[in-house]
Design a protein with these regions (language model features):
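Acidic, aromatic-enriched beta-alpha/helix-loop junctions
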Residues: 71-86, 241-244
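Basic/polar N-terminal segments that are highly enriched at the extreme N-terminus
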Residues: 1-41
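FAD-binding core of flavoproteins
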Residues: 181-261
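A short, Trp-centered hydrophobic/proline-enriched beta-strand micro-motif
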Residues: 171-184
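Internal helix-loop-helix
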Residues: 78-174
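N-terminal-proximal low-complexity accessory segments that begin disordered
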Residues: 25-75
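General beta-strand structural signal in soluble alpha/beta enzymes
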Residues: 52, 175-178, 210-212
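Glycine-rich loop at the start of a catalytic domain that most often binds anionic cofactors/ligands
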Residues: 62-67, 96-102, 190-192
């Protein structure tokens, strides 16, 4: 679970243009991640506010309860290095080979290869390797933003493609923050006693949006570089502020992670 109270999303595929150089230099090392060892190094030195069983975690990278899940993600990089045919693909945006978890499927063969890669990673790790929701999210948002632009004459799709391209070139892990806390399941988000049971927009400006709320069951968020925050239920007109999809860095100011509940 993680809470966002409040968070200013400075860069979002649905709000702002994005610069690859700015992404790399502002948050992570300037070199793309190429293997599991690189990935582990990319997690060092982050300022994450994490609580595990009521205690603040000072070093999540080497915490004995967290490290096994990190090792599983590292294997997604090492498999791509050992078997690029299985775990990487050619990006239609850049023409370069990218990790298959960052690839937007172009054919039924791509989907078959996704399944084969996931099956192999399950055999190698024996656990969840935490990148499936992020992969599914960029694939669904690819078509959703395209349809939105066609209907509303917006520019979401090109902004989204620019962000995905930046993620591919840096070879980042994308966490999919989808599951809501929900609260009273008989009520819509806007009718909840606590509005923060669902992530929602609290302020908008030309610079971006401010969001607040909670998501649940996001173990892989700690092991990601960026989060795609998405709603998970059907929303009505009164839930407009809850209909937000955006990308935020894992170590963005204002995020609190509650791990292990």
């Amino acid at each position: 679970m993680f809470f966002v109270r409040p968070l200013f999303s400075r860069i979002s595929p649905l709000q702002r243009s994005i610069s690859l150089n700015n992404v790399k230099k502002s948050k992570f090392d300037s070199s793309p991640i190429t293997n599991g060892a690189d990935y582990l190094r990319s997690l060092s030195g982050r300022n994450l506010k994490i609580y595990l069983f009521g205690k603040l975690v000072e070093d999540p990278l080497n915490h004995p309860m967290i490290r096994p899940s990190i090792n599983a993600v590292a294997e997604t990089y090492d498999l791509a290095a050992r078997d690029p045919e299985l775990a990487s693909a050619t990006s239609p945006m850049t023409g370069a080979r990218v990790n298959r978890f960052l690839h937007i499927a172009q054919s039924s063969d791509d989907l078959v290869m996704q399944g084969k890669m996931q099956r192999r990673l399950g055999q190698l790790t024996g656990t969840c390797f935490q990148r499936c929701v992020g992969m599914d999210a960029i694939n669904s948002l690819h078509s959703t933003t395209f349809d939105m632009d066609a209907k509303y004459n917006t520019t979401y799709h090109q902004r989204f493609l620019a962000w995905v391209t930046a993620m591919q070139q840096a070879n980042f892990v994308l966490g999919g923050a989808m599951t809501d806390v929900k609260g009273d399941r008989s009520k819509a988000p806007h009718a909840q006693e606590d509005p923060d049971l669902f992530v929602h927009v609290t302020r908008r400006s030309d610079a971006g949006v401010w969001i607040t709320g909670a998501k649940a069951h996001q173990t892989g968020c700690l092991n990601s570089h960026w989060l795609l925050v998405m709603p998970t239920i059907r929303l009505g007109e009164q839930d407009r502020d809850y209909a937000i999809v955006g990308a935020v860095p894992v170590d963005a100011e204002g995020i609190t992670y509650i791990y292990g509940i």
